[in-house]
Every structure is written in C-alpha cells, then in structure tokens.
C-alpha cells in the first residue's frame, strides 16, 4: 500500500501550542526558532498522534494550564486512502480513535514514527527503567501481542505486590502461575528481537564514526529456565519488601562500548552517538518488519553533535519519504520551512530563508 504519510496535524490545548492545523508535504519539513518556541512540543504531539505513545509521567502535563482536556489529530495518507487518528486527553486518561471508532494502541499503524531527540542520551546514562521503556515501546510496535502481554504482566505484578504487602502468602501460587506464563513469553520475545536490534545498532554506531564496537545484551534478573525456582526461593524477601523482586520488569538493556558499560565509561559525545545508533536501529527494524518507512521526527538536529554526526542526521532525514526536522538553525534542503514563535508555526518564504541564512 505504500508508506504512511502525515498530511496534517491538528492540536487543541496541547502544552504551549496554539490551536490549529499544520499541513506537511512529503520530504523534509524544517522548523526553526528559539528554544521554548514549541518545536519539541509539536514533535511530541505528532509522535503521540502517530503511535499513541507518550513518555510523559502524567497525562495532565500534556494539557495547557487552565484547561481540562486536550486533543491531537493526525490525517494520514497511505496509497490513495485517507485515515484519521485522534487522541483525546483528560485527567488521567487517554482515548484513541481511528476514523471515529475507539481503538487501542495496537490498532494504529505499526511503523508510525521514530523520534530522535537530545534527551535520548538518557538511554545511555539514565536508569534501567528508561532502557526497558525504550525496548518495550519498540517491541510493542513490532508485535501487538507483546504489548498486550506486557500490559497483563504489569497489572499482575501490581496485584501480586498488593498481595505481598497484605501478607497473603497463601495466594502466591496463583499469582506465580500467571507471572510465569506472561513473564516467560516476554523474556523469550525480548531475546529474539534483541538479536537483530544488536546487529543494526552495531552497524549504525560504526557508520556514525565510532571506533568502539557497540553491543546490546539483556541483563536478566531471572531466566525462563529458572523463573519458577527464583520466585519460590525469594518468597521471604518479597514478603518482607512487599514487592516482586524478580522478573522481566527488573531487567536492563546493557549497552557495551568496547569492553565497558557505556553508562559508566562513555563520554557525553560517545553516549550521544550510542543513542543515535539505537534510534537508527529502531527505524531500520520497523522498516524491515512492516516494509515501509516510519515518519522521522528529528528534534534539534544541531544539539551536542559534531559536523559529521549532524550531517549524518540530515542525510538520514533526506533519505526517508517524510521527516520533520527542528532546530535553532535552518534545516538545509527542506521542502517546507516553518518558523516557530510562541507555539505558532508560520511558513517562511524563499526570500526570507535567504535573508536568514546570510544574517
């Protein structure tokens, strides 16, 4: 059917964005402006509308101050067909619709979008929870079943923790049976997917000019073979702590650069390169799985990057069917350029671009 294209994005009461609709062409759309002008919020809204996912700790953070609801809508074209994806946001809730019908995240186009941003360095230097979230987000898009089983697993862990806090040791065998089934499936899926993700990230890291080999491995708190024994063996500890201490929710995605963990030994520049390699691997894995390119969302293409890596990102944006690139500078080669000011985005004429470029 061809690649999915974002033809228009509409927002209402979303962070600092002015209400309205922006139309996007194929190719690169460049958005430039000062920090705080709304560029990142626009990409966040696009990513939410395209994938149904957000990493905001609370939904309320996405809603403008003084408002109780927010709304984003993506008009998508694929081949000759048009589809509309909507996300309604309220206090503690998120509602998805596809062509007016309520939907789940798994019902959205699986490729969707890949969002590259300066904060991705936290994938390298931040806590294990961020790396798990990266992996789970990607795998949920590769497999709707993975996302469903992960949600069931997380609910089960929460319910089991409540039973542990209540001292309900008698109920553990019931929860353990459910955990074993769900957790084992999650671990096995992660292992299979990581084989290819590791290969792609290694290639991307080399293309970015790193002379150190990147490797991705799972640091697991248990294994499918020992899971049942580990749950039984740590029962007393879990009752004392009131929480489930073993399972895939405690795993880490270990990033090794050369012979050492990147989180401990990589420089800031090396960490940024590793993060870019992860996002490039994400894009390639989605492309391989679904046979189409995600929309590339590239936030602040000049941030913390040397000229080689900056050009790498610009070349990547030019190589995909559609990309939205933001920065404090003009993005070269854009089919459309928008200026961001106080949450509003206005087209920039060729004459203005030439003046900006020589200023």
UniProtKB/Swiss-Prot annotation:
This protein's UniProt keywords: ATP-binding, Cytoplasm, DNA damage, DNA repair, DNA replication, DNA-binding, Nucleotide-binding, SOS response
Keyword hit for Membrane: no
Gene3D superfamilies, sorted: P-loop containing nucleotide triphosphate hydrolases, RecF/RecN/SMC, N-terminal domain
A molecular-function term among this protein's GO annotations: single-stranded DNA binding
Record has Glycoprotein as a keyword: no
SUPFAM superfamilies: P-loop containing nucleoside triphosphate hydrolases (SSF52540)
GO cellular component: cytoplasm
Recorded family membership: Belongs to the RecF family.
Name assigned to this protein: DNA replication and repair protein RecF
Source organism per UniProt: Deinococcus radiodurans (strain ATCC 13939 / DSM 20539 / JCM 16871 / CCUG 27074 / LMG 4051 / NBRC 15346 / NCIMB 9279 / VKM B-1422 / R1)
Gene from which the chain derives: recF
């Amino acid at each position: 059917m061809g690649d999915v294209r974002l033809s228009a994005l509409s927002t209402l009461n979303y962070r600092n964005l002015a209400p309205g609709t922006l139309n996007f062409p194929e190719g690169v759309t460049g958005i430039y402006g000062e920090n705080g002008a709304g560029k990142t919020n626009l990409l966040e809204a696009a990513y939410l509308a395209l994938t149904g996912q957000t990493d905001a700790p609370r939904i309320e953070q996405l809603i403008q101050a003084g408002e109780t609801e927010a709304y984003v809508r993506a008009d998508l074209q694929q081949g000759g067909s048009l589809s509309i994806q909507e996300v309604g946001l309220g206090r503690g809730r998120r509602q998805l619709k596809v062509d007016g019908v309520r939907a789940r995240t798994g019902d959205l186009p699986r490729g969707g979008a890949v969002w590259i941003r300066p904060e991705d360095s936290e994938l390298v230097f931040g806590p294990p929870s961020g790396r798990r979230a990266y992996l789970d987000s990607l795998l949920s898009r590769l497999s709707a079943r993975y996302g469903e089983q992960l949600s069931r697993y997380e609910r089960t862990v929460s319910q089991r923790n409540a039973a542990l806090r209540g001292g309900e040791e008698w109920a553990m065998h019931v929860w353990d049976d459910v955990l074993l089934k769900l957790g084992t499936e999650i671990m096995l899926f992660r292992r299979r997917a990581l084989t290819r993700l590791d290969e792609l990230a290694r290639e991307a890291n080399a293309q970015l000019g790193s002379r150190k080999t990147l490797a991705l491995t799972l640091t697991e708190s248990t294994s499918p073979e020992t899971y049942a024994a580990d749950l039984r063996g740590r029962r007393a500890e879990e009752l004392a702590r009131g929480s489930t201490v073993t399972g895939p929710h405690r795993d880490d995605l270990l990033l090794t650069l050369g012979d050492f963990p990147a989180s401990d030994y990589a420089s800031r520049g090396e960490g940024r390169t590793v993060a870019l390699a992860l996002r490039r691997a994400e894009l390639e894995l989605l492309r391989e799985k679904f046979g189409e390119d995600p929309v590339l969302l590239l936030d602040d293409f000049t941030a913390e990057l040397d000229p080689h890596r900056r050009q790498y990102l610009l070349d990547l944006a030019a190589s995909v069917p559609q990309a939205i690139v933001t920065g404090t500078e003009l993005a070269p080669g854009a089919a459309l350029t928008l200026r961001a000011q106080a949450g509003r985005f206005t087209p920039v004429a060729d004459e203005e671009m030439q003046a900006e470029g020589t200023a």
